[in-house]
């Protein structure tokens, strides 16, 4: 494996480019676990589209299902850089498992931590951080993806309860979650200002989650449709207040994009590792192909993308640790890292030649798994519009 050499230099604003001893320990723990428990069965799980319940349980025992959850709520109380290195190491081994973790941590736990009441935090975070419960994030609908301000799922107040009806689509962890954060419109006349978020326990009558099959990648992760038919949710399970739902969703997506970007760094690292190993072992014309200039060019391009993506992720994590606005930096990291992961996987397949087209080597899986990173948590095009807004001061997609 190619291990990045730490750069012990302070940036002008105090950001450091080397990991702390604690962060290095977390990286090594995650790497050892990934190489021992995740990598050996990744191909078979992908072939069988089999969700790894056993591995998720072991990650829970390590504390890796709640790394950034404060200790008082059952988590490890780590910072965002430590979270990033966990996602990177797990993503290098199997993006399906990294996706499960990202949804659990970035979209579910962090949303409750940032927006929940004290009672909600104490009720749900310990169960999520331990892995006793898995969570999911129900925003996308069959006809609503990037335009999250126009939800069709409805929530109507009935005494001390809200009654929710609607459907959600492409929900990671949806079929295995015990808790869903569901976004619904309380008053269509208010448009995005009428959206609210609800904590829905999935054993509630009227809730179902049929699994979606036939995905290009992330085959051993669970993806489902959420169907809510007269689902009654206690009023105290609203997350935040009416009108805050859209803001909660956008805030959560910042955390989600950070997780995706971190996992994509892992994919790129995996592509570099696999390509260097193969190029050093494969011979042609009487020498290892690693000595050919055009093969080195493919690998060098991957290394450049790896270093750039990792630094963008760490920059976003640094700002998140400081508690300052980071939407711009998180979008930059997600945009660059996801597209770079696709480029790296294509280059890695090219290095491997015909073998790269077979699942005998991991690089074809890296490509299939990388592609979805350019789509979920906001497409590449949405990230460009976000960056364009910061550059020009004009919001091309502001809710009307």
Description of each model-found segment:
Residues 78-79, 147-149, 173-178, 191-194, ...:
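Short glycine/proline-enriched turns and hinge-like loops at secondary-structure junctions
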Residues 109-115, 137, 149, 189:
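Flexible, glycine-rich active-site loops centered on histidine and acidic residues
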Residues 160-161, 165-210:
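A short core secondary-structure module
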